[in-house]
Amino acid sequence: MRVLYIHAERFSWESREPALDIRDEPGSGAAANALVVFVSVERGDSSDEEFLRRVARDVVETAEKVKATAVVIYPYAHLSNDLARPYVAKEVVNKLYEVVKSEFKGEVYKAPFGYYKAFEVKCLGHPLAELSRSFKPEEARVAKAVEERRDVYLVLTPDGREHDPAAYSPADPDLKALIDKEVFKRELGGGEPRYLDYLRKFGFEWEPMSDVGHMRYGPEATVMMELVEDYAYQVAKSLGIPVFKIRGTNMFKLSEKAIETHARLFGERLYIVESDTDLILRYAACFQQFAMAKDWVISYRNLPFGMLEIADSYRHEQPGETVVLFRLRRFYMPDLHIFTKDLAEAVEVSYKVHEAIFREIGKLGRTYVSLYNVTEEFYKSHRDYLVELARREGKPILVRILPTQKYYWVLNVEYHIVDELGRPREIATFQIDVGNAQRFGIKYVDENNQVKYPVIIHTAIIGSVERYLYAVFDTIAKAEREGKTPRLPTWLAPVQVRIIPVARDNLKFAMEVADKLEEAGIRVDVDDRDETLSKRIRDAETSWVPYVCVVGSKEEETGTLSVRIRGEGQAKMTAEELIKRVREETRGYPTRPLYLPRLLSQRPTRG
């Protein structure tokens, strides 16, 4: 923060026209014998109380030293080339004004933020009449860190007992890994994960012509992404409540109070876009769904209900922390918000969400260890609720108790798998939000015709689209470490069946079989390339195609296919039997068509 002090015999100001979308109400004023405090808020400054009290003490001491009877806080953007974002600067200036007002015995004024202003000043011209200052928040943060109450961690077992993580010896190695990472901040696992090799064959890769942390998705990756998106909607509907699927924008104005406040509560990693106004790229679907829900007329009879969007989401992760398919600056979130009457109903609905989260990861052959982030007040009043969730998990949970409510939630449950390298990796989540309905103006009318604000559950039951696929590939990596053949779930395989004609004469029959399979909703292609049979079979294996059918004259005559089943061996079956088998393996999952030309000869090869 840069500050210029002017001890003025007279000082007056008047707002003329708006300079920013984020601004105070217009105004004017005047003061005599005033210390005028021209303030430029810089990047890195914050509304941290200790920092602002340090600045305020200097303001008050200077005012008393020059015997000023008034102080004027004047937002002034021309003292620095490294200014904070307007929404940050406005908050810092306004809070500085409040702190100075509480500590200075004379009059304290503030010129409006966000305007072109006219001012007149008559400087008194003594040795202390013009002074400059520079303040850095780091010094205040160090002092505050000593005094600030730290988060408390404990292990809560299904029988309701609490344990100190330092003295607790978990039987579950996954829980131990979570405790080591979260409580003791130990670096876990090392080496190159296998899943990175898998991703290249399916077209999941960084986009070098974009910002750090942005991916591109080839045809195989795209069909897998869209299948997971479809499945996320299917899972949301399985909760047994009405779910409204929507679409919206990814940019929101920071000048909107609700957006600005929610962004501050989210914390760091905001993705800001500079335009003719400051815009924030959404970090989940919250902004759009809440902006839409506030315009709905909602009755208690409508609750609970959900809103789902597959939201392109943006988080400004550090460049060295981005990991393909896991930690990204841009990703796709099947973000479900469930609107409930009150906290009691939110608790009841959360049991369904919790059950669905474990059910879905169980379908991949995995389970979660859970971290429960909770405010101290909520833990004291709802401890039995957390014990019940632990009981439903059937194992101990790690609880982090925050002394104050720093975020928009009172409970945030993170569900972690432990990957092939022994590292906890958060996939799914749910949160209970008691403030955003009022912040955005989302209301409902209860049975007594009273206007109420719903309690909102935020959840990504299967995680982001990318993280769900990360869990799939990590599961395959673990299986391969155990000596098993790597294999995608059949419903997710970009190509479910490949037909390889032995000779050119067999191509017509191969296409007829492919037609039959395609009509049954199976993604099928035909390898008609002028390559040897062994190479084409090898390429199908490299591509992890679950079913590879080699058709020659014998198969044409008998109508029986020679099928290589990935990870199992060879079998003879008719096209109808193959269709039945694929349908059994994909029952309950969405389908999509092939996103590639059927004939491999028509496809460009990767460089």
UniProtKB/Swiss-Prot annotation:
Keyword vocabulary terms for this entry: Aminoacyl-tRNA synthetase, ATP-binding, Cytoplasm, Ligase, Metal-binding, Nucleotide-binding, Protein biosynthesis, RNA-binding, tRNA-binding, Zinc
CDD domains, per the entry: ThrRS_anticodon
Cytoplasm as UniProt keyword: yes
Identification of the protein by name: Threonine--tRNA ligase
Compartments where found: Cytoplasm
Family per similarity comment: Belongs to the class-II aminoacyl-tRNA synthetase family.
Residues engaged in binding Zn(2+): C286, H337, H458
Coiled coil: none
Gene Ontology annotations of biological process type: threonyl-tRNA aminoacylation
EC number: 6.1.1.3
Region: Catalytic, residue numbers: 193-489, 194-489
Complex and partners: Homodimer.
Transmembrane annotation, as ranges: none
Region (Editing domain): 1-143
A GO CC annotation given for this chain: cytoplasm
Taxon lineage: Archaea, Thermoproteota, Thermoprotei, Thermoproteales, Thermoproteaceae
Cofactor(s) recorded in Swiss-Prot or TrEMBL: Zn(2+)
Record text on cofactor binding: Binds 1 zinc ion per subunit.
Pfam families: HGTP_anticodon, tRNA-synt_2b, tRNA-Thr_ED
Molecular-function GO term, any one: threonine-tRNA ligase activity
Catalytic activities: tRNA(Thr) + L-threonine + ATP = L-threonyl-tRNA(Thr) + AMP + diphosphate + H(+)
UniProt source species: Pyrobaculum calidifontis (strain DSM 21063 / JCM 11548 / VA1)
Domain notes: The N-terminal domain is an archaea-specific tRNA-editing domain that hydrolyzes incorrectly charged L-seryl-tRNA(Thr). Catalysis of tRNA editing is performed by the charged tRNA itself.
